A protein has these predicted regions:
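Alpha-helical transmembrane segments in inner-membrane proteins
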Residues: 1-345
Length: 345
């Protein structure tokens, strides 16, 4: 079998997989809009969307339309964007740090963003999504600066970067706990703790617009550096030998993943393991080339996060679980498998 035939078959496989993933994502989002305390038939969900797009004019229950457009569709779309963003960050960091256990929170950026967002909520610095996002960005930048200081900027090694990220996480988690315990009321503390474990209950269309722009721009930057990421898989020396400006490419990608993570944390809290699990599965299915891996991880991460949000609302209905609890139930066994395989290599 010639190389041209193999390449054609691989292209057909990738195209078919992408189309199937997009269709599955649309179906999962529709399911996410359908389920809840008020169950909405799936055909009503599709008609509500097609009516809004001007494709149909099917009369629908106004309560259903209000629930779909005012609450659930924006929630499902934000969940999809957050899952895609976390998976992209995980794929990038696993290559940059050459570590199978790296994920978006390894640099302490999530903990820093949580501290900034919690400070805005508890101290009443501002109101609305803009203030929350600004607080999260400030906290994420502080955590990133702390890690950069400990690792000597962009020249720090992979091991030093991971250790600095652990230190930053512990520091900012402690600051968050202190802020909540000394400044929040009992009800406010409960609400903040639930949010910190991951929740999409408060997101609306403005949050979707912001996270969509950030994730798409972040994906574009990462795809631009996809060849460099392929080289980083073999180590910094191999990347440098190919003419890649290692310190500056690392810095650009670290900043990109930090901004994506901060945006997600400001809207949904800390949701772990998506950035760990998804890139590994996609790498196994589609190979290590990052131009394919990043897109596959984004689609799979979006699907997984919407499913996790659905499960969080259904497992103990009518109450809701934090989304982070659901992703941990999936991620912890996978984490154990990675450690076991690493030990036996």
């Amino acid at each position: 079998m010639t190389a041209a035939v193999l390449q054609a078959r691989q292209g057909l496989f990738l195209t078919t997989s992408a189309l199937l993933a997009i269709v599955l994502l649309f179906l999962v989002i529709a399911l996410g809009v359908s389920v809840g305390e008020l169950s909405i038939p799936l055909d009503n969900v599709f008609y509500a969307i097609s009516n809004k797009m001007g494709l149909t004019e099917v009369p629908l229950n106004r309560i259903y339309e209000s629930v779909i457009w005012d609450f659930r569709l924006s929630r499902a779309l934000v969940a999809a964007c957050c899952g895609a963003g976390l998976a992209i960050c995980g794929a990038v960091l696993q290559s940059l740090l050459n570590n199978a256990l790296a994920e978006p929170y390894v640099l302490g950026v999530s903990a820093g963003a949580s501290t900034g967002a919690v400070s805005v909520v508890v101290l009443g610095v501002g109101t609305g999504a803009v203030s929350l996002s600004a607080g999260a960005f400030a906290g994420a930048f502080a955590a990133f600066a702390f890690v950069a200081f400990l690792t000597n900027g962009a020249r720090g090694g992979n091991e030093r970067t991971i250790l600095a990220g652990v230190a930053a996480s512990q520091l900012f988690n402690a600051i968050t706990a202190y802020t909540i315990s000394t400044s929040a009321s009992a009800q406010q503390a409960r609400d903040v703790m639930f949010w910190l474990l991951g929740s999409f209950s408060g997101v609306r269309w403005p949050e979707f617009q912001l996270v969509l722009v950030v994730v798409l721009l972040g994906l574009a930057v990462c795809l631009y550096y996809s060849r460099a990421l392929d080289a980083f898989t073999f180590g910094d020396d191999a990347a440098a030998s190919l003419g890649i400006a290692v310190p500056w490419v690392r810095l650009a990608l670290f900043i990109t993943t930090a901004l994506i993570t901060a945006t997600i944390v400001s809207m949904a809290g800390s949701i772990g393991f998506v950035g760990l699990v998804v890139p590994h599965v996609m790498r196994f299915l589609f190979g290590p080339l990052h131009r394919t891996l990043l897109i596959a991880s984004a689609l799979a991460g979006a699907i997984l996060m919407v499913l996790a949000d659905i499960a969080s609302r259904m497992l103990i209905a009518p109450q809701s679980l934090p989304v982070g609890v659901v992703t941990a139930l999936v991620g912890v066994p996978f984490f154990a498998v990675i450690i076991y395989r690493s030990r036996n290599k």
